[in-house]
Amino acid sequence: AGAVVGYFAHKYKENPPVMVVCEASAADCLYRSAVQADGNLVNVTGDLQTIMAGLACGEGNTIGWDILKNHVTVFASCPDWMSAKATRIYANPLENDPHIISGESGSVPLGLAYTALHDEDAKDLKEALKLDENSNILVISTEGDTDPVRYREIVWDGLYGTTESLSKDFFYNNMIL
């Protein structure tokens, strides 16, 4: 995340895009670090159980954190259902959109964008992301279906369906001064 954010922050110095870091809520160290707002990293310990196994680290990279804390607009702590929903969206495209096989860790940015656009409880997030009908959204998935059995359970069987409400504080707008 630090390398991608650093690239876009450097390339578009005068008008940087809105940049978001999505984490599994069970291991949301960067989100917690941003909320703490003292510039230091917070480690998450204990049960880091999540379907987003690639994001279940609980510890941020100190070099990357320096870039992220200064350039990321929103840090999001995302529930598993948000990732699962996006995995299904990628697998079942509309009209001429391509079919994409994305694992759970790679799907969560699309899940956050979809939630911001379609969930009334996420209207503050939509505002923080400056999303409207003219927005262009780039989501980056860095993972295929690393667990084919789990992927099929999510896509075919509806594992981790949307059954929870969003927590009021599931995202942090890092750019509020």
Language-model regions: role of each:
Residues 1-70, 120, 125-171:
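Glycine-rich phosphate/pyrophosphate-binding loop at beta-loop-alpha junctions
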